[in-house]
Amino acid sequence: MFEKTNRMNLLFDFYQELLTTKQKAYVSFYYLDDYSLGEIAEEFEVSRQAIYDNIKRTEESLEKYEEKLGMLKKYQQREKLFSELEAQLTKKNFLDEQVKDTLEQLKNID
C-alpha cells in the first residue's frame, strides 16, 4: 500500500493539471491528506461509493497519462543517473570519460 501511495503521489504531482477540479480534490484528500473515503464523502456530501469510484477512475487516468507521457519514468531515470554521477564525482576530483558518458545519458533522456 505504501508503494502505491508513493506512486500515486508522484503521478499526481506530474499530471494533476490534467485532472478535473473534483478529481484533484478527491485524490488530494485521499492520498496527500490521508482522509478515509467516508471522511471525503462527508466533506463533499456524496456517497462513499461515489468517492471510491471517482478515485479509482482517477488512478486509471493517471496511469494512462504516465503510459503515454512517461514523465515519472524519465524523472526516475534522471534521479538514478544523478546518483551515479554524484558517486563518480565523489571518487574522482575531475571530469573523466565515465562522467562525460553519464552526462551524455542525462542529456538524452528527454
UniProtKB/Swiss-Prot annotation:
Belongs to the UPF0122 family. InterPro entries: RNA_pol_sigma_r3/r4-like, UPF0122, UPF0122_fam_protein, WH-like_DNA-bd_sf. It comes from Listeria welshimeri serovar 6b (strain ATCC 35897 / DSM 20650 / CCUG 15529 / CIP 8149 / NCTC 11857 / SLCC 5334 / V8). HAMAP family: UPF0122 (MF_00245). Might take part in the signal recognition particle (SRP) pathway. This is inferred from the conservation of its genetic proximity to ftsY/ffh. May be a regulatory protein. Signal peptide: none annotated. This is UPF0122 protein lwe1821.
